[in-house]
Amino acid sequence: MNDVDRIGLESAVVRKTAASRAGFTEGSVGRHLLKLGSFMAVGTMTMNVAQLAEAVYLGMVSTEALAAMGFAFPITITLFAFAGGIGSGASSVIARAMGAGDRDRVTLLVTHAQILAIIVGTLLGVFGAIFAEQIVQALGAKGVVLDMTIQYLQVYMFGVPFFLLSIVGSTLLRATGSAASPGIIMATGSIVQILLGPIFIFGWLGVPELGIAGAAWAYVLSRLVSIVLYSALLIRTRMMRLVLDGMPSSWMAILHVGGPAILSGLIMPFSMLVITRLLAGHGHEVVAGYNVATRVETMAHMILWSASSSVEPFIGQNWGARNFDRVKRALFLTNSFSLAWGVFTFVLMLLIGEFVVSLIDDNQVVSEVASSFFLIIPLSIGFMGIMQIATSSFNARGLPLPALVISVVRTVVVYVPLAIVADMFWGYVGIFLATSATNVGVGIVAWHWNRQSVAQQKGQRDLNSSLNSRKTESLES
């Protein structure tokens, strides 16, 4: 065996060993996705149960408190865009490094991603604390509702660094091949929030009654618990190494995907700001009804979010290991599940949606708004899931711009203009119709684009491999 053959054999062995260490490059595709998705679903469902419990607690306070949460939601979802973007960028780079067997780079990226999350979270928290009142006023909140929204956000902004770090920590664990831990830790944090909520809101166990601010304190402390658990697990598995060398290059690699992902995530809050402003024109009770309905529907939608979040590290590792057929299989399975879950959600919301809303608030207008929401939107969330899966696929393969384009087209080109026009003709029902139509149309386009992109990128990488093989053969001769 000559030197070239020996080097080629050793490289193949290294790639095989690296792929074996990365947990998603071997074994049943469906089983990996089920394990990833099921544990994430447990975590996200528990998180949404906590949000629903929060709505129940605040419904006991007043309808104004529920409306205040509706005005706070576009702001909190904006912060989630930063957390999700940093997490998506880190997940893409880390998963591909895991697939290629570069563990040293993985540990550096994990550490540097968390430092980035802390810095960004602190800056956002300070900015939000300064400008929260102006933003909420611009959304249309007035009087008692405005005061309650500010009370909630003042506490929430203090916990923004904890929030970002907990979301990024979950993403890092998934990217490094841990399927169960992120979901379990997320569920633990949510249970803490459910338990602390009434204590702070109603003043149980000798704690001062804080009202809506108590809901924010419960959330902040629950995120702190999650951070402690994530950090302990990353340290125990030796996935963290306090080395600052190379941090700028790590941040550049993370933000190559994470930057466009943040912009993509910010576009959705922009649409939420517009939609909330449109709904506010119909009264605070309509905003409250929309807020309650979205919290109930989000419980079902988070299953699809779990699927799209889980497929990202799977695609990243297998793309790094050049297992292209496994990537195609994963996309087929998750897209099929998304459509099936959309149909199931539609039927479920028709059967129990109105009843769940009545447990939170018995206001007649709130109930009517929620009923219209459940009749129109849930059937389209399967297509929303397909769009999210396509976005995750692009990011996992290191192609952030298509994901950004999808978000821009969905929100700026289609959704917001359509919602404004529909609101003029059919009121808040028209806004719901615009949401559903946008989900279906953009979901189909995103699926087709992602399918073509995978085939084209695979063909290009196969061509590059063929050219490299020919160069090696010419060197041998």
Residue ranges and their predicted role:
Residues 66-126, 163-177, 181-182, 289-347, ...:
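Small-residue-rich hydrophobic transmembrane alpha-helices
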Residues 87, 156-174, 182-190, 215-228, ...:
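Short runs within selected transmembrane alpha-helices of multi-pass transporters and secretion channels
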Residues 24-56, 60-61, 74-89, 93, ...:
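N-terminal transmembrane alpha-helices
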Residues 78-81, 193-198, 227-231, 299-302, ...:
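Hydrophobic transmembrane alpha-helices of multi-pass small-molecule transporters
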Residues 1-40, 94-161, 207-259, 315-380, ...:
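Short alpha-helical transmembrane segments in multi-pass integral membrane proteins
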Residues 35-54, 155, 166, 189, ...:
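Transmembrane helical elements of multi-pass membrane transporters/channels
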Residues 128, 171, 197, 201, ...:
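Structural signal for membrane-spanning alpha-helices in multi-pass inner-membrane proteins
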Residues 45, 49-67, 136-143, 199-210, ...:
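Helix-terminus/linker motif at the lipid-water interface of multi-pass membrane proteins
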